[in-house]
Amino acid sequence: MYYCISFTYKNTDIALREKLSFSNETKKSEFLKIISTHENIEECLVISTCNRVEIVAFVKMACAEFIVKSLALLCDVDKDILLEKADIFEDSGAIHHLFSVASSLDSLVVGETQIAGQLKDAFAFAVKNSFCGVHLSRAVHSAFKCATKVRNETQISKKPISVASVAVAKAKELADLTQKKAVVIGAGEMGELAAKHLIAAGAKVIILNRDLQKAKDLCERLGVLSEYDSLENLKKYLNQYEFFFSATNAPNAIITNSLIEELPYKRYFFDIAVPRDIDINENENISVFAVDDLEIVVQKNLALREQEARMAYGIIGRETSEFFRYLNDLALMPIIKAIRLQAKEYADKQLEIALKKGYLKKSDKEEARKLIHQVFKAFLHMPTVNLKHLQGKMQSDTVINAMRYVFDLKNNLEGLNQYKCEFDMENNDEIY
């Protein structure tokens, strides 16, 4: 069954999410290797962003305690705290949750499209490292399909808002950004988003990054309203400008009290990184806004999106039902093939017995075989037609299980591609 363990801004604070975050691929790979050793876990992937850690799996049976215990040990967190905080979803609930996440209905900022790219990256990583197979492939691709339908059929993402854009919106409330210079620390995806929103607001941006080439490349994409420098010069910039947006992947805070000088004007620091980049004392001239603080601005946008969200949830509900109908349909064809194969095997076996006992001449063997197969074909025609008519219907799962029991089809199904998936798991260019 499908299984999801979720830690988000809804059930955890930023301090706990910092500890749980998978800021590098080595840590993510280590965790997936650990949990994939469990006999009940067949496939798994991890989505890790500043607002959520989602463990999505296909399992034989529920195993939340093992997964949470493994996460607790790796991240040095109390297991009982995680079990208390975790939201756990099973089967249809897990698929509905995954579709909601992909469609940005579960995001801090409903309607932002950044999560789709993050899910894509998480899926690609799991496929590349052999943690993900056909079960999660079906689920993730269906999640992308659902997200596309939500975007196309509602207005929820027509004006996309990310955490970075919310930070810039908050800055615009505090001052007119036109012609001001803002410092963006980090040249990754979140830093680039912040820079784009700042430029759109009329500001000029300075990109600071450890990798100077990456900062240069970003500035080339941003255009003439941007410049760049090395992160080594951070202190100089911190004590020269008013607005700072920090979005690095550093494991510890990079902006601390030791770098801050007292100045006679106000400075605003927006920490949009997890783990946090900023650990400084606030005073009358220094204000710090962390990821969780931005929810205040987010609430202003939620009212405008509630109606679209209701429409989107309707789509997600229908797509969830459609997904499980699709899985049932996948199971029907192997049942039909297995029954026909079983009939052929019994016919051939009885034919050989008849030949051995002299009930049938060898010269008549092929004619007898054709006759027997025609009889079975005619006999199985109506059951086959009726089974095909069950495709997409609610009772198909009950009938499939009954057919497996009545015809003892367990062994016959082993040689059939029961879990056929139309997505190419070998070619990374096609799995998206």
Swiss-Prot record:
Amino acids binding substrate: 49-52, 107, 112-114, 118
PROSITE patterns: GLUTR (PS00747)
Keyword presence, RNA-binding: no
Metabolic or biological pathway, per its Swiss-Prot or TrEMBL entry: Porphyrin-containing compound metabolism; protoporphyrin-IX biosynthesis; 5-aminolevulinate from L-glutamyl-tRNA(Glu): step 1/2
Site residues by UniProt (Important for activity): 97
Cysteine pairs bridged by disulfides in the record: none
Catalytic activity: (S)-4-amino-5-oxopentanoate + tRNA(Glu) + NADP(+) = L-glutamyl-tRNA(Glu) + NADPH + H(+)
Record-listed E.C. numbers: 1.2.1.70
GO biological process: protoporphyrinogen IX biosynthetic process from glutamate
An MF annotation (GO) of this entry: glutamyl-tRNA reductase activity
Residue numbers annotated as active site: 50
Superkingdom assignment: Bacteria
Note: During catalysis, the active site Cys acts as a nucleophile attacking the alpha-carbonyl group of tRNA-bound glutamate with the formation of a thioester intermediate between enzyme and glutamate, and the concomitant release of tRNA(Glu). The thioester intermediate is finally reduced by direct hydride transfer from NADPH, to form the product GSA.
Domains (record comment): Possesses an unusual extended V-shaped dimeric structure with each monomer consisting of three distinct domains arranged along a curved 'spinal' alpha-helix. The N-terminal catalytic domain specifically recognizes the glutamate moiety of the substrate. The second domain is the NADPH-binding domain, and the third C-terminal domain is responsible for dimerization.
PANTHER family membership: GLUTAMYL-TRNA REDUCTASE
Subunit structure comment from the entry: Homodimer.
Protein name: Glutamyl-tRNA reductase
Source organism of the structure: Campylobacter jejuni subsp. doylei (strain ATCC BAA-1458 / RM4099 / 269.97)
